[in-house]
Amino acid sequence: MHATVTSSSSTATSGSRRLRWRVVDIVVASVIGVAVGVVFWAWGVVWGPISGPIEALLPGLQAGPAALWVVAGVLGALIIRKPGAAIYTELVAAVVSALIGSQWGGLLTIEAGLVQGLGAELVFALFLYRNWRLPVAMLAGAGAGLAMAINDLVIYYAGAAPLFTTTYIVSGVVGGALIAGGLSWLAVRGLARAGALDRFAAGRERREV
């Protein structure tokens, strides 16, 4: 009986330690957020020439490539693997993008980052921060893409036609799954293979395979 209680206590302690943020987690998550925030800003600079032809092809389809703006949360969560990582990295990226200069305004950019990070965070939380495989990464990307699409529709496209709304949501979800989910997962594997993530579970997993 004593051994069972001790074992259970040890397991609980181990689980708590696994989910606790370290200094290195905060530093790396911040670096990811800043780096991706610069990418967000650059994407905003070229967004007009890119989104125009896509929207002309099918209005609402532009939400697909817009999913690049939800990459930070998924990428950060896949590397840090701690509660709040998706929200934190996406929010930092949004703040950096806003500080450099966002065409959508600072407050709306930061609000979007918070919403998009939450969309990814909820999926990882649903799996109790234990499953980091490709399907879950893509599902988290889809969640972030869905959050982005709904947020955009409420703020920028209120009263849009049903066809546009449906196209925008579907495009955002698919784009989020492929760009934020799939590409982030591949990026983490590449970084782990290069030895850049040796202090994280993602790097240790790759080393053990």
How should these model regions be labeled?
Residues 40, 44, 48, 77, ...:
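Membrane-water interface at transmembrane helix exits
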Residues 30-33, 111-153:
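Short helix-perturbing small/polar motifs within transmembrane alpha-helices
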Residues 2-6, 11-76:
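Hydrophobic transmembrane alpha-helices
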Residues 38-65, 95-109, 148-171:
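Membrane interfacial helix motifs at helix-loop boundaries and amphipathic/re-entrant anchors
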Residues 1-13, 19, 23-27, 39, ...:
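Alpha-helical transmembrane segments and their cytosolic interface
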